[in-house]
Structures are given as C-alpha cells and as structure tokens.
Curated annotation (Swiss-Prot):
Keywords: NAD, Oxidoreductase. This is Mannitol-1-phosphate 5-dehydrogenase. Its EC number is 1.1.1.17. It comes from Geobacillus stearothermophilus (Bacillus stearothermophilus). GO terms for biological process: mannitol catabolic process. One of its GO terms (cellular component) is cytosol. InterPro entries: 6-PGluconate_DH-like_C_sf, 6PGD_dom2, Mannitol_1_phos_5_DH, Mannitol_DH, Mannitol_DH_C, Mannitol_DH_CS, Mannitol_DH_N, NAD(P)-bd_dom_sf. It comes from the Bacteria. Belongs to the mannitol dehydrogenase family. GO terms for molecular function: mannitol-1-phosphate 5-dehydrogenase activity. NAD(+) binds at residues 3-14. It catalyses: D-mannitol 1-phosphate + NAD(+) = beta-D-fructose 6-phosphate + NADH + H(+). HAMAP family: Mannitol_dehydrog.
Amino acid sequence: MLAVHFGAGNIGRGFIGSLLSQSGYEVVFVDINDELVRLLKEKQEYRVIIADENRQELLIRNVSAVNSQTEREKVIDYITKAHLITTAVGPHILPAIATILAEGLQKRITINKTPLHIIACENMIGGSDVLKSHVFEKISEADKPLFEKYYGFLNCAVDRIVPNQKHDDPLSVVVEPFFEWVIEKRNIIGAIPPIQGAHFVDDLKPYIERKLFTVNTGHAIASYLGYYKKLQTIQEAMCDQEIRSDVEKALHESGAVLVKKYGWNENEHQSYIQKIIQRFINPSISDEVVRVARSPIRKLGANDRLIGPATQYYDLFGQVPHGLVKGIAALLLFDYENDEEAVALQKTIQETGVEGALYQYSQLEKDHPLVIAIKDQWQHLK
C-alpha cells in the first residue's frame, strides 16, 4: 500500500507518517524543503521518540520523499498510484497544494479508477471539505461528477502535541505519548482505509468541539497567562498554581457547554479534562509559550477556542464564564513583536479599543455582557 503525505514537518513525520508506516503503508512525503526531502530519500527511515520517562524510540521505515516544486511529475505519478492521501501542511497552505493535487487526481482518473480517500489532518474544522473546495476550483464542471464518484474527502480531528525542536539528526522527532486521530465516515467510498490507531465515527462534530474547547482552549489560556507572567514554556505556566487554577476553571466552563450540548457523562468529561492537564505538564515536552500563543487574531474567531465556548456558555446558562473571560483578556495583552497578528491586534486595540477589536475579530456587539466583562478583566490585568 502507498500513502502520499503532503507535509514532511514534525507533525507529518511524528504523527501521521508514523501511524501510516505502522499501518503497513509505504509513505512518500511531499514537501518543498530541499534538506528534508534529500534526507528522507537518502535514509528512507527516521526516529520518533516518545516523550515520557521511558523515552521509547520507534524506527519508521519504508519512507521516501519528493519535492513538489522541482519534481512535479513524480508527485503526480505517486498520486495516480496512491492508496491514501493525507496532509499536515497547515490550514493556510491547503490552497497551495490544491493545484498539484487536482492535476494528479485528474490524471489518475484516466488510468486508475480505484476509489481514493484524501484526509486533511489540519488543526481546523472541516479541513478536508476546505481542501476539496480548493481542488474543485481547479477542475472542469465535467470532471466534478467523476471526482465525487472516485474520491472521498474525509474530515478528521487530530490531536498530538509536537513541540518545536532541534536535533543533531534533522529527521528525528519527539512527540507526546497521547494521540487522537478521529475520522468521519460520511464520505467513505467503499472500504474503510486501514489506519492503525485511527478511530472512525459517524459524526465528527462532538469530537472536534471536545478537542477545540478542551485541548486548544486550555493550551491557549496557559500560553497567554504564561506570557503575561513572563514565563517561557507551557510547563512553567502550568506549574504556576494561579494559572493552573485559571485554566481548570475555564475548562470546567467549556466542559459544561459540551456536556449540555451532547449529553455526555459529566464524570467522564472531567476525567478527559484531567488527562489534558497532565499532557500540558508533561516534563518531557518543552513547548514555548510564544509558539502556542501565536496568531491571536485567528484565535479570537467567533467559533474558535475562546470566544466559541464563552458565547455558548453565556447563551446556555445566562452567566459570564469568568475563567474563559480571563483567558481572552490575557490574549488581548499578547504583544509579542515577532508575531504579525499580535502586532496588528495591539494596533487595532489602540485605534478602536477592546470593544472595537472584539467587534472586528469576534463579531461581538459592543454592549454584549461578555465584551463588558472582558474589558473589565483586561483593565484589571493591565
């Protein structure tokens, strides 16, 4: 079996590529990083180190790579032969890979009519739907029914902390022990693709929201409060009792939303929250506060990790979620000068105030009780 994976970065190698290799696939990575592509071609293997007290090492074999800029025809050829296509390139790169993917899929239809699944493993909601829409922009109306017939774009939720890192061997990658890869069955054509460790479900939305409103919410709040207290890593932040208490408070609020919406068992969800907290304090993973805090404007989105659970909490319970509000206020103070969004956010706040920023980025009306509470907390933290 052949899997073509777009994105040879740490998540691609340490999470998706690793699981695909362990599932029996030959994995061909597609990337534009010359050095990574050269090393993967040369060595055809790499190490994945599990970040726990045992430091277990997995040797991932039967891998190769191609450069999508200089070896375009090879990429297209691999797409025509693939049994599975996956991506881990970042949401903003999906439009860039759509052209070559569309080209490869068009050629494949003429020579190989075996159904094929494409899974965008990105930290976003509906990543494969987004990729499909970009691909469909590149093809003719006549080809669209054929693409619908033979190509299943499967949405998924992925969760594994893979921090920034440097090693003597550039291919080695350290990952946390925990991982979750949940794939929606809705667009499967024929047989379910064999992927060891993946979990196939009928409805992905509860899993996406559970991850977004727990892992991403907690991670974000730890990072912004950590930055506020001038701490360097998420682990340092979570060892600060005040920050840990604030994070737990916010996760109980977002958890109340999830339990109410999906009818989950409250005790089971509290256990999930504690599992997530333990991941954040894993001493074997050093995750920089400024990495986790990056792109604050995107994270202020109306349906994203902070505003999403906060507005839903207010709508469901008629109360202000003070843990989430404190996290949002800390985000509004994130002024890291090497982050373009942080710089732009501070400029917006200076020009239009906190109310203007929340209206522009979060679609919250200026007299909304959440806006009033966030501004009060922001002034208190300042």
